[in-house]
């Protein structure tokens, strides 16, 4: 989960990373009070999860509270690279800046370790630095057991060739940034720029944080950080039911068990769709191994609630997941939706194979629901689902 700048700033402050004061607001008039709290001057910064805010006009200085209101009025509702600005941060003006640096920690999947990155060339796109002057970007592996103490931080600073007059201050910031990375179960923490001010302070002026959602079970506070405005309502509903769901731009709803099978199903449906009006998969939904009838019912309810879906393909190979449980889930979901007065009109194509497949097929046959069609091969079922979706367009 990627955070907004103001959320990253709050986490930095929580763990001792030096930051400037700031407040997030969502109405122009609130900018007045927030600026007054900061002494009458501020920086108004659009809160979007994309770079290039400054060039897009999403970062403006305000010399007084009235100007802060005007700037907030201009920025709220702005579109920046497809992201609508719903909030702005009213931030304290930085003291005069003498130098800008870059520091970060991230998960290095290739080498199966953590990586510290640091550069004396901050305030710009770090990918550009890595491409044009790779020698200016130090990359230092970090052992997960040892972590980053002040000695390790000094090693990072030395490899990045920070000037002697800021070396200790940057090292101390690196220690607190590592504390943030570990304590918050982050995949990335980045400060760009980390600045040295004329009065000698080291400050984190802007930052990025990406959190590992797999650690949500031990990070209850992270739920409050979710972006409710940007969340797809179907994805939000699926997450609330602990379903692995991703909305796609298509017409055939997909339900399967196991990520590999679901990915294969997407491919097969996309291929079949070429012969049926170029219909495509509408989603990724993995109900997982050992899914119960309740999980199946929850998944089907999400899929049928998608207005883009014209047909549904349920593709299950029973291993830990028993096909009779899947069949019961389908029957229960349809009955539940109809009991709520919801008109279910989207046809379902079901392919069951493996554990208790015959029993699952019998359950569907006995239910004899007019919208459910059984097809016993994956290719045949994909073709039928694509055909039905095309006919309903």
From Swiss-Prot:
<feature type="binding site">
    <location>
        <position position="257"/>
    </location>
    <ligand>
        <name>substrate</name>
    </ligand>
</feature>
<comment type="similarity">
    <text>Belongs to the succinate/malate CoA ligase beta subunit family.</text>
</comment>
<dbReference type="GO" id="GO:0000287">
    <property type="term" value="F:magnesium ion binding"/>
</dbReference>
<keyword id="KW-0479">Metal-binding</keyword>
<feature type="binding site">
    <location>
        <position position="206"/>
    </location>
    <ligand>
        <name>Mg(2+)</name>
    </ligand>
</feature>
<dbReference type="InterPro" id="IPR013650">
    <property type="entry name" value="ATP-grasp_succ-CoA_synth-type"/>
</dbReference>
<comment type="pathway">
    <text>Carbohydrate metabolism; tricarboxylic acid cycle; succinate from succinyl-CoA (ligase route): step 1/1.</text>
</comment>
<dbReference type="GO" id="GO:0005829">
    <property type="term" value="C:cytosol"/>
</dbReference>
<dbReference type="InterPro" id="IPR005809">
    <property type="entry name" value="Succ_CoA_ligase-like_bsu"/>
</dbReference>
<keyword id="KW-0436">Ligase</keyword>
<dbReference type="InterPro" id="IPR005811">
    <property type="entry name" value="SUCC_ACL_C"/>
</dbReference>
<dbReference type="InterPro" id="IPR011761">
    <property type="entry name" value="ATP-grasp"/>
</dbReference>
<dbReference type="Pfam" id="PF08442">
    <property type="entry name" value="ATP-grasp_2"/>
</dbReference>
<protein>
    <recommendedName>
        <fullName>Succinate--CoA ligase [ADP-forming] subunit beta</fullName>
        <ecNumber>6.2.1.5</ecNumber>
    </recommendedName>
</protein>
<dbReference type="GO" id="GO:0006099">
    <property type="term" value="P:tricarboxylic acid cycle"/>
</dbReference>
<feature type="binding site">
    <location>
        <begin position="319"/>
        <end position="321"/>
    </location>
    <ligand>
        <name>substrate</name>
    </ligand>
</feature>
<keyword id="KW-0816">Tricarboxylic acid cycle</keyword>
<keyword id="KW-0067">ATP-binding</keyword>
<feature type="domain" description="ATP-grasp">
    <location>
        <begin position="9"/>
        <end position="237"/>
    </location>
</feature>
<keyword id="KW-0547">Nucleotide-binding</keyword>
<dbReference type="GO" id="GO:0004776">
    <property type="term" value="F:succinate-CoA ligase (GDP-forming) activity"/>
</dbReference>
<feature type="binding site">
    <location>
        <position position="100"/>
    </location>
    <ligand>
        <name>ATP</name>
    </ligand>
</feature>
<dbReference type="GO" id="GO:0004775">
    <property type="term" value="F:succinate-CoA ligase (ADP-forming) activity"/>
</dbReference>
<dbReference type="GO" id="GO:0006104">
    <property type="term" value="P:succinyl-CoA metabolic process"/>
</dbReference>
<feature type="binding site">
    <location>
        <position position="95"/>
    </location>
    <ligand>
        <name>ATP</name>
    </ligand>
</feature>
<feature type="binding site">
    <location>
        <position position="192"/>
    </location>
    <ligand>
        <name>Mg(2+)</name>
    </ligand>
</feature>
<feature type="binding site">
    <location>
        <position position="45"/>
    </location>
    <ligand>
        <name>ATP</name>
    </ligand>
</feature>
<comment type="subunit">
    <text>Heterotetramer of two alpha and two beta subunits.</text>
</comment>
<dbReference type="GO" id="GO:0005524">
    <property type="term" value="F:ATP binding"/>
</dbReference>
<dbReference type="InterPro" id="IPR016102">
    <property type="entry name" value="Succinyl-CoA_synth-like"/>
</dbReference>
<comment type="function">
    <text>Succinyl-CoA synthetase functions in the citric acid cycle (TCA), coupling the hydrolysis of succinyl-CoA to the synthesis of either ATP or GTP and thus represents the only step of substrate-level phosphorylation in the TCA. The beta subunit provides nucleotide specificity of the enzyme and binds the substrate succinate, while the binding sites for coenzyme A and phosphate are found in the alpha subunit.</text>
</comment>
<dbReference type="InterPro" id="IPR013815">
    <property type="entry name" value="ATP_grasp_subdomain_1"/>
</dbReference>
<feature type="binding site">
    <location>
        <position position="92"/>
    </location>
    <ligand>
        <name>ATP</name>
    </ligand>
</feature>
<feature type="binding site">
    <location>
        <begin position="52"/>
        <end position="54"/>
    </location>
    <ligand>
        <name>ATP</name>
    </ligand>
</feature>
<dbReference type="Pfam" id="PF00549">
    <property type="entry name" value="Ligase_CoA"/>
</dbReference>
<dbReference type="GO" id="GO:0042709">
    <property type="term" value="C:succinate-CoA ligase complex"/>
</dbReference>
<dbReference type="InterPro" id="IPR017866">
    <property type="entry name" value="Succ-CoA_synthase_bsu_CS"/>
</dbReference>
<keyword id="KW-0460">Magnesium</keyword>
């Amino acid at each position: 989960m990627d955070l907004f700048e103001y959320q990253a700033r709050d986490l930095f402050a929580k763990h001792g990373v030096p930051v400037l004061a700031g407040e997030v607001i969502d109405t122009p008039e609130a900018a007045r009070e927030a600026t007054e709290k900061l002494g009458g001057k501020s920086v108004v910064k659009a809160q979007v999860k994309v770079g290039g805010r400054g060039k897009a006009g999403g970062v403006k200085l305000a010399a007084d509270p009235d100007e802060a209101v005007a700037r907030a009025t201009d920025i709220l509702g702005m579109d920046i690279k497809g992201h609508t600005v719903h909030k702005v941060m009213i931030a304290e003006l930085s003291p005069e800046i003498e130098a800008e640096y870059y520091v970060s920690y991230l998960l290095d999947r290739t080498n199966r370790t953590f990586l510290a990155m640091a550069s004396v060339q901050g305030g710009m796109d770090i990918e550009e630095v890595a491409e044009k002057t790779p020698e200016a970007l130090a990359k230092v592996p970090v052992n997960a057991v040892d972590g980053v103490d002040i000695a390790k931080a000094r090693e990072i600073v030395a490899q990045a060739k920070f000037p002697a007059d800021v070396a200790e201050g940057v090292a101390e910031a690196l220690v607190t940034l590592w504390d943030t990375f570990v304590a918050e179960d982050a995949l990335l923490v980045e400060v760009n720029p980390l600045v040295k001010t004329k009065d000698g302070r080291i400050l984190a002026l802007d930052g990025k944080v990406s959190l590992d959602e797999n650690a949500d079970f031990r990070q209850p506070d992270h739920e409050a950080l979710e972006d409710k405005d940007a969340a797809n309502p179907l994805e939000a509903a699926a997450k609330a039911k602990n379903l692995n769901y991703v909305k796609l731009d298509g017409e055939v709803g997909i339900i399967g068990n196991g990520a590999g099978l679901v990915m294969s199903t997407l491919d097969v449906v996309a291929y079949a769709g070429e012969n049926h009006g170029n219909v495509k998969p509408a989603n990724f939904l993995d109900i997982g191994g050992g899914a119960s009838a309740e999980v199946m019912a929850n998944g089907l309810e999400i899929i049928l609630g998608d207005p883009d879906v014209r047909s549904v393909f349920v593709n299950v190979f029973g291993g830990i997941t028993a096909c009779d449980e899947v069949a019961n889930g389908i029957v229960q979901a349809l009955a539940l939706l109809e009991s709520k007065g919801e008109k279910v009109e989207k046809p379902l194509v079901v392919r069951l194979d493996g554990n208790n497949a015959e029993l699952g097929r019998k359950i569907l046959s006995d239910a004899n629901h007019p919208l459910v069609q059984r097809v016993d091969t994956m290719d045949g079922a994909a073709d039928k689902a694509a055909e039905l979706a095309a006919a309903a367009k």
